Regions:
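N-terminal glycine-rich anion-binding loops that anchor highly charged ligand groups
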Residues: 12-16, 41-42, 48, 53-61
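Generic N-terminal amphipathic, Lys/Arg-enriched alpha-helix
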Residues: 12-29
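A short alpha-helix capping/helix-coil boundary motif
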Residues: 20-24, 44-47, 62-66, 155-156
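A glycine-/small-polar-enriched, mobile loop at the entrance of the PLP active site in fold-type I
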Residues: 24-33, 52-58
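A non-catalytic, amphipathic alpha-helix used as a structural packing/dimerization or gating element
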Residues: 34-42
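Active-site-proximal beta-alpha core segment in soluble small-molecule metabolic enzymes
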Residues: 52-175
C-alpha cells in the first residue's frame, strides 16, 4: 500500500467543511497534529534505518510550538541565518545547521553560539570565516553547485541553473 493510500482524506476537499471551521478567523493556518506526528515518525524511521540525520528546515516550517512533537524524531534544525539558528537552538533540542548565501562579519560571533555546523556558499566566505568557525569547535561545509540542472522552465528556482549564485562551481573552486 502506498503511503498516500493510508492517509484519511481531508473532509473539505470534495466533501463538507467541518462546522468548527466556520468559527475560525481567516486567514489562519490549520495543522493536523496527528498527520504531523505520523510524518515525523516516518522521518525518524528513515533516520534509524539509514543512519542519516534528518533536520527540520525552519524556512519551510518554523511553528516552534510544535517542535516538541517533532523533536523525538529529528536530529535538529536547519537555519538560513542568525535568527533561525537562535530559534532552533532555543526551541528544538539537537543540532543546528546553518546555510546562508553570505554571512555578515558582525553576526558571526553570535551565530557561533547557536550553530553546530556552518555551510559556506563560496570559497571566499570559507576563507574569510572558516578558521574562526573551526576554532570555535564547529564543523564546516562548502555548498557545491554541480552545474547539472534536473529541471526545465524554472531557472529562477533552480540552484544549478547557469548564473546561479548558490554554491561554488568548479571554475570558482579552481580560481
Amino acid at each position: 500500500m502506498a503511503l498516500h493510500d493510508a492517509r484519511p482524506p481531508f473532509a473539505a476537499i470534495g466533501g463538507t467543511v467541518p462546522p468548527e471551521f466556520s468559527a475560525l478567523p481567516t486567514p489562519c493556518y490549520l495543522l493536523d497534529e496527528n498527520a504531523l506526528r505520523r510524518n515525523a515518525e516516518i522521518l525518524g524511521g528513515l533516520a534509524q534505518r539509514t543512519g542519516c540525520r534528518v533536520l527540520l528546515a525552519q524556512k519551510a516550517f518554523s511553528n516552534y510550538d510544535l517542535y516538541p512533537l517533532l523533536a523525538p524524531h529529528l536530529a535538529g534544525t536547519e537555519a538560513s541565518g542568525l535568527f533561525e539558528a537562535r530559534l532552533g537552538a532555543e526551541e528544538m533540542p539537537g543540532e543546528v545547521h546553518v546555510f546562508c548565501a553570505a554571512y555578515r562579519a558582525d553576526e558571526m560571533d553570535e551565530l557561533l553560539r547557536y550553530a553546530d555546523h556552518i555551510v559556506f556558499n563560496s570559497p571566499a566566505q570559507l576563507a574569510k570565516f572558516g578558521a574562526k568557525v573551526k576554532a570555535a569547535g564547529k564543523s564546516v561545509g562548502l555548498r557545491i553547485n554541480p552545474e547539472c540542472s534536473t529541471q526545465d522552465g524554472h531557472a529562477i528556482y533552480d540552484p544549478c541553473a547557469p548564473g546561479s549564485r548558490l554554491g561554488t562551481t568548479r571554475a570558482a573552486w579552481d580560481a
